[in-house]
């Protein structure tokens, strides 16, 4: 019997059906315009672009321009690439332009789809960012689709790491910019450490199209981008602690694989105290619970996590004396990305490689908050519907399933569940042999490098030629994936999310065409494609006769989305294909979430060695377990976002003020307001309201005025005067400081004074914000314990972080006021030297952002990749970026502000 919801959908259609239906008249308009645009010359296509630009500037909406613009873009793509966009690709582009996520199945041509929405929105001249998951795809797509944009008269750029700054600024100034999500986020942070407007990369955040949007906005949502600087070296502590961990017994800790957490038991804590005392890490009489034990306990906890939660060749690999993390969703290496809070150092100690110093945060942002900066955001992926609720709640993005150009002919078989992993792999080997014997290409999906290499060894012993795609073969990725659809091909891949290259039966025609065009840019794209397709036809026919691509997965992932991405590699563009999952009760997901019930079923059925249970309810049971995991992860991301939103509001205020300062011509009003506010604070502190004169702290006020305001006025005499009140003293201080600064401006010259004010303000903001970030990190790490006292940690964090922010602003005002009061007239050379010194200190911080060394919470962090440079008192770039109250890097023992950081 049909449910009410099912009957309703049959009568009225689903919301998705209605959205698709609404675009059909627009697609019909575009198709009707096609003959008109086919008649245009190459120059005529560019002239149309100029016409559209003019109409947009005159107020015509992009929606009104869409049919003509899409028709123009379709014709340009046909001429430049030999590709005529399908109606379904145009439909996907409409959804992108409307600010949705377009779910297009693998092989439906997302790369070309994006060009239409990018072209239309690029007509405004405000820039469009097309976001990819790796630099290879960014460069490939920019070169490939750049020919289309070029034919239309738009400029295309690609921003990637390690490129010259001038070239990167030019790339961002293009109409269309391709870049990875990491590079965009880091460049945003770098921009907010710059001191001159002409150094800025990202002028505005107009429209972003995010490819593999689920990978970037869901899987990496908990990953903060962090620009960091070096802190003190604790490598010996990590080595000492690492020697302790192997002595820990199983009853000394509790491991929760569901939450990926490990903690010491009471027995473990007792054992720790004993062994740490023996190692000299705890002093006689010192307990683990003493405040002074915090650091060593933190190191021990991270050491335990490194040994019990992180596995070599699954979570990371060791390459060239470095621990390189592996993306659990894509299987790619993530060079330069480091775990935070000393966890990466603990893994380095575990593996016996060089231990790099921990880093301190200079600037950070999450992908969630970075991509919410854009005026309009859209995305593409083959799998988004399972996360539709999160996309809408977090980003305000709707998900629309775009119809396939041809019906899907792939057969998705029920899961086969074996009792042991050995039985499962033996069954998989037989399946691979069977398919390979008839020439059917096989794509074998695994979840770790270790398992992919184990399967590879089994195939070698069986004499089956094959390719392996995992983090170790990262560089050959595109070619391995492109060849996976060839006759008789066997490919083992560790996760297929965001691979970017299409698996086409018989081989990837698009990649061959692109390679040929790169080798001969003057070749006719349509003729070249026709020639390659003719050669490819026989190969494809053989593969079709063998049954198409067979996807064989060795495990289910925690996310249904990742499983669907693997399945979706087969059956592209209506091709035949097959997919199946071979599982065992020893698999991680089965073991953690559902093996007990299945174990009973298997025993009841009395399955023999090598037999498997195959039934639809097994699939449903696993999908329910996956759904629970997805829901839990969504809740974690929501909670983390609530905390990050607190910092994000403060970040927007600071970065906004910073940009205003950089754009301002005259900052004297701002610095005057700061100075007056400092005076108000002094009056309130030392001459409290509603108090008598004999209760005032005149000596404290006098000392503060001398130190902070740089004036020597008879405060002690003023307070003795008959009838004088706090307001009168305030006015005298304001008058005296205003007079002082007016004199300084006259002595320096107005232009020099404005430059000094700007540089001092920017330096103070950067220093105070960096210190504030560190304070917030510490607060965030301990605020969770407030829950034990029946206090909401989030509210506690909000309240205390606001108070800390207010305190930071007070400190900022005092710092700027004090520095401005201390400057004295200099020669022109001295003035320039001081400005250059301040800029050099800022440049040192920016230099930390230039290299790809980074990390936090498994997040990317940009930081210094080289060893510390020796201090040179004549070269400020070697000074690092110490805070005003930190020790001077010259090792004089003085505070930086009293030594080389002195501004006099």
UniProtKB/Swiss-Prot annotation:
Record's bilayer topology term: Peripheral membrane protein
Keywords: ATP-binding, Cell inner membrane, Cell membrane, Cytoplasm, Membrane, Metal-binding, Nucleotide-binding, Protein transport, Translocase, Translocation, Transport, Zinc
GO terms for biological process, alphabetical: intracellular protein transmembrane transport; protein import; protein targeting; protein transport by the Sec complex
Record note on cofactor: May bind 1 zinc ion per subunit.
PROSITE patterns: SECA, SECA_MOTOR_DEAD
Residues holding Zn(2+): 888, 890, 899-900
Xref: Pfam families: P-loop_SecA (PF21090), SEC-C (PF02810), SecA_DEAD (PF07517), SecA_PP_bind (PF01043), SecA_SW (PF07516)
Gene3D superfamilies (UniProt xref): Helical scaffold and wing domains of SecA (1.10.3060.10), P-loop containing nucleotide triphosphate hydrolases (3.40.50.300), SecA, preprotein cross-linking domain (3.90.1440.10)
UniProt GO molecular function: ATP binding; metal ion binding; protein-exporting ATPase activity
Reaction(s) catalysed (UniProt annotation): ATP + H2O + cellular proteinSide 1 = ADP + phosphate + cellular proteinSide 2
Family: Belongs to the SecA family.
Name assigned to this protein: Protein translocase subunit SecA
Gene source species: Roseobacter denitrificans (strain ATCC 33942 / OCh 114) (Erythrobacter sp. (strain OCh 114))
Lineage: Bacteria, Pseudomonadati, Pseudomonadota, Alphaproteobacteria, Rhodobacterales
